[in-house]
């Protein structure tokens, strides 16, 4: 995740958010928000939260200077037109996180899960442009420790299951 401000903003770093507004999607991008909000709390930065319905609204609020900063996901920034991103500046980037995982409920028969997995891997192998249009760099089998251990490390360890 990233904390962005309007390019003309006087805010230069995360600590400058003290007593300034930070817009973000309430409940959205859970892991991204969680880690950056934890950093703000650990650094005792007393920001003014502004909860919005969408992440795009948060970004728009920084662009239009309605709020001082916005907390957004890195993927969103790749979807925004250059004429918007050129008016924004990143003042903080959180740790790199794994992309979202596809997870199947236990009640779904394993044969159906395997067919879905095979179809996704076929897209990866046969239609790489389709993956790129979805902002996916690759599809791989998820590994709990490799892919999600970062959350446990940042949140103080413990059982991740």
Predicted features by range, described:
Residues 5-22:
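Flexible hinge/capping segments at coil-to-helix
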Residues 7-9, 27, 75-76, 96, ...:
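Solvent-exposed coil/turn segments that connect beta secondary-structure elements
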Residues 30-52, 78-85, 152-157:
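Ligand-binding cleft/hinge of the Venus flytrap
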Residues 61-64, 68-88:
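A ligand-binding cleft/hinge motif common to bilobed small-molecule-binding domains
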């Amino acid at each position: 995740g990233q904390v962005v401000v309007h390019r003309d903003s006087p805010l230069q770093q995360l600590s400058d958010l003290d007593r300034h507004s930070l817009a973000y999607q309430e409940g959205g991008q859970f892991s991204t928000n969680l880690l950056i909000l934890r950093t703000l709390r650990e650094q005792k930065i007393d920001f003014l939260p502004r909860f919005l319905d969408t992440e795009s609204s948060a970004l728009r609020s920084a662009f239009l200077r309605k709020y001082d900063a916005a907390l957004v996901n890195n993927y969103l920034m790749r979807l925004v037109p250059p004429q918007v991103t050129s008016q924004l500046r990143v003042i903080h980037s959180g740790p790199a996180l794994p992309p979202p995982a596809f997870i199947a409920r236990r009640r779904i028969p394993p044969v159906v899960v395997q067919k879905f997995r095979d179809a996704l891997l076929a897209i990866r192998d046969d239609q790489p442009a389709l993956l790129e249009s979805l902002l996916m760099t690759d599809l791989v089998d998820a590994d709990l420790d490799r892919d999600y251990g970062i959350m446990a490390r940042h949140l103080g360890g413990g059982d991740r299951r």
